[in-house]
Amino acid sequence: MDLTNATIITAMVTPFQESGEIDFDKLPQLVDYLLANHTEGVILAGTTGESPTLTHEEELQLFQRIIELIDGRIPIICGVGTNDTRDSVAFVKELATIAGIDAVLAVVPYYNKPNQEGMYQHFKTIAEASELPIILYNVPGRTAACLEVETTLRLAQLEKIVAIKECAGLDAITELIERAPKDFLVYTGEDGLAFATKALGGQGVISVASHVFGSSMYEMYQALEQGNLPEAAKIQRQLLPKMNALFSVPSPAPVKAALNHLGIPVGNLRLPLVACTPEEEQRIIRTLEI
């Protein structure tokens, strides 16, 4: 399944039990809820899924369970990015043997701080080893390294690299939409830029807010596609403070609090992340108006 119909992709949270183990029993309700609210693809074991605290075996178990639950209805994208190229290569080769995975998400190497040629060679090596399509993930606020537009454009020439989740701002998004091959999909990874990215001709958004406001975001994109710019802009303006509230303390604490409040139990977080304080949670829920 390709990504051409996936405009709102949810970077899915990972439910945990009180003991800290993955709560696989909570996944069916979460998946059904996301599908009912217009999620058009899911990313597993990404930033929002708390990938740094998941073991390799846990990730594989999570992927298998979600594959069973989604059953081909929307694309499944699995996080494989590490700051070790050989490790990432081994992971993409392993995932190619699992039926039901549609693409992988590979983040810019973090902590090492490679230069642009190092980033290019990192992703090129992964692409040459992968049987699955690859989405690049540029998030300089977390990795301390930024994939520059020129490097992304070089990578976009490679067969297996099909898209980017771009979190380096609207200038980078705009230039990529203008200059990249037309079949290279540009997603924003920032909910606040969901409207602007789509309006500029991008594919859409890889979203945290879609856990809570997926239906409203879908309506916004429908309005854009129908040429109703004022209505789409109105929805984005109304959503923006709510989107910002979901990042008012380290994510995914706010969105997990929101889901729990909505009756979609996803539990707590794994250290070093911590849950919202009662005061933070009250403020967030009040802003979200849920």
UniProtKB/Swiss-Prot annotation:
InterPro entries registered for this protein in UniProt: Aldolase_TIM, DapA, DapA-like, Schiff_base-form_aldolases_AS, Schiff_base-form_aldolases_CS
Q: Where in the cell is it found?
A: Cytoplasm
Question: A Pfam family for this UniProt protein?
Answer: DHDPS
**MF-aspect GO terms:** 4-hydroxy-tetrahydrodipicolinate synthase activity
Record's catalysed reaction(s) = L-aspartate 4-semialdehyde + pyruvate = (2S,4S)-4-hydroxy-2,3,4,5-tetrahydrodipicolinate + H2O + H(+)
Q: What class of enzyme is it?
A: lyase
Q: What is its EC number?
A: 4.3.3.7
The principal location of this protein is cytoplasm
**NCBIfam families, per database record:** dapA (TIGR00674)
Question: What does the UniProt record say this protein does?
Answer: Catalyzes the condensation of (S)-aspartate-beta-semialdehyde [(S)-ASA] and pyruvate to 4-hydroxy-tetrahydrodipicolinate (HTPA).
Protein name according to UniProt: 4-hydroxy-tetrahydrodipicolinate synthase
UniProt lineage: Bacteria, Bacillati, Bacillota, Bacilli, Lactobacillales
Q: Which gene encodes it?
A: dapA
